[in-house]
């Protein structure tokens, strides 16, 4: 999940540097969503992790 977030962030930075404003905004939004979902899944797995039998 975090890898996808970083990939979208890099795409957004490259698009912003080249002047593609719409594409940069879309990629940055996707990066934020993927990052937040990754954090939520991490916290869920942390709290509901492997329990002793």
Curated annotation (Swiss-Prot):
Classification via InterPro entries: DUF1328
Record localization: Cell membrane
User: Which Pfam families does the record match to this protein?
Assistant: DUF1328
**Chief location:** membrane
One GO CC annotation: plasma membrane
Q: Which residues cross the membrane?
A: 4-24, 30-47
Lipid bilayer topology: Multi-pass membrane protein
Alphabetically sorted, this entry's keywords are: Cell membrane, Membrane, Transmembrane, Transmembrane helix
- Nucleotidyltransferase: is it a keyword of this entry? no
Which protein family is named in the record? Belongs to the UPF0391 family.
The protein in question is named: UPF0391 membrane protein PC1_0455
- The organism of origin for this protein: Pectobacterium carotovorum subsp. carotovorum (strain PC1)
Tell me the organism's taxonomic lineage: Bacteria, Pseudomonadati, Pseudomonadota, Gammaproteobacteria, Enterobacterales
